[in-house]
C-alpha cells in the first residue's frame, strides 16, 4: 500500500497511481520448504514530514520495547501489552487497529496471537511476529514487523533487514 492507503492495515490494491512523496508500506514474505515468513517495512519517497517521523519513531520504539521483553512463558496478552502500552501512552491507542503480532509457520497466521484475548503462554522455539502500527485514517499508516524465535530467556530476531529510516 502507499499514500493514504497505508492507513488501511490490510489494503487491497487498486488502480491508484503512486505519487511523488507517497510513503510505501511493504508487507512481504515468502515460503521456503513449506514454512512462511513475514515482515513489514516502510519506504519514504521523500523525507518524512515531522508527523510521519514522529509516528514512525513511536512505532519503532514500541516494537523495540516488545522485542526486548518477549520470551517463553509470558502470555500473548502480555506480549501485546508491551507494544500497545507505549502507543496508548502517546495517545494513539485507538489508532493501533490490530493485534500486536501472530504466530507463523506452515500458515502465515497461526497461534499464538499477541492480543488482549490470548492468555496462553508463548512457547520456546515458536516463531512469532511483532508488528505494532498506527493508522491515521485519510493520512497514512506506519507498521514495522519482524519475526522472532522465542527462547527460554528472550528471543532472537530473524528479520535481518534494517528498520532505520
Please state what every model-predicted region is.
Residues 1-165:
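Active-site neighborhoods and metal-handling regions in enzymes and metal-associated proteins
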